[in-house]
Amino acid sequence: MKRTLVRPFITSAAMLLLAACSATGGPSAGEGVMVRQITQSAYCGLTGPGVAFVRSEADREALLDVCGQNMATDVVRKVDLSREALVMVTLGQKPTAGYSVGLQSALAQGESLVLDMRVNEPAPDMMVAQVITSPCAVLAVEPRGWQQIRVQGLTEQPLVRTLEN
């Protein structure tokens, strides 16, 4: 009795594995890229939705010295800029507490880094502090000579930042 159940199970598992291995991405498919979220904050001090790409110590310090910022700057300063670049994704000013932004996924499409971000906002009936916030997430990315960063999920249209060499 056991043998009659094991054989169909193994056959089904093998078919499923073969089907998964033969699947390919569509025309917009990209390859995976090493991106890690190192911190996020409700108070980044930046007023509009946007994306900043940081490759130098001077650029990093300028971003961390923004007035009104309250984030874990020590973890940002620990990133070795010779091995990784930093990307700061900002949601812009919000009228209350309860908003946040975080990395959902990342992929490379040619020379473009595509970041899919998740935005959380307070429920309509939630009690929140009436305070201006400026949520952001700071990401560490592998440097691949990116020509463009495309951020999806913050605004109706993707934010696109063209990078200089």
Language-model segments: residues:
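Exposed, flexible binding/inhibitory loops of compact, secreted disulfide-stabilized domains
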Residues: C21-N165
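Sec-dependent bacterial lipoprotein signal peptides
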Residues: M1-A19
